[in-house]
Amino acid sequence: QRLTLTQPAAAALYAGIIGDTGRFLYDLTTAQTHRAAADLLATGIDAPAIGRQEDQFPENVGRLIGWALENVHITTNGAGSLIITQSVLQQFGLQYGEEQRAVGNIGKLASIDRWVVFTERQDGKYRVELRGKTKEINTLAVRHGGGGHPLASGAVADDEAEVQAIEKELASD
């Protein structure tokens, strides 16, 4: 017995697919992913409108992205690192968690093949978000008590010393 898929449900699923696959760019995107998206498109959803909606962000987030691209440190071997402090979040009128859009945008720089974004939490620890275009970074996350997917992982750094250790390890990989 088949379930009926409503357009709102199809639209939500399609938004999830394009988000999770980076608009079908990520390595784990398969033919099955494309078939599922095609089935959702067949329901009559407005894919361009969904794509535009998923691609938009508030002006203050855009300004943070510009700041992030200007301030990311890039090593000669393609490792990028950025620290977003509580004062930076305040400067852009953002709450903790609203800086997420900056993480993926750093990877759009051609000179970077792996990167880390540290976001200072209220308790002084740092959320660690590791990303790689082709180099797996999840083992680095595991070494620091985190985990995740081969090209997208995370952890928590207890202090600035651990932040520096992660930066050094990422640059040496």
Each model region followed by its residue ranges:
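Hydrophobic helix-and-loop "lid/oligomerization" segment in the mid-to-C-terminal part
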Residues: 14, 19-173
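A short, charged helix-loop
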Residues: 1-16
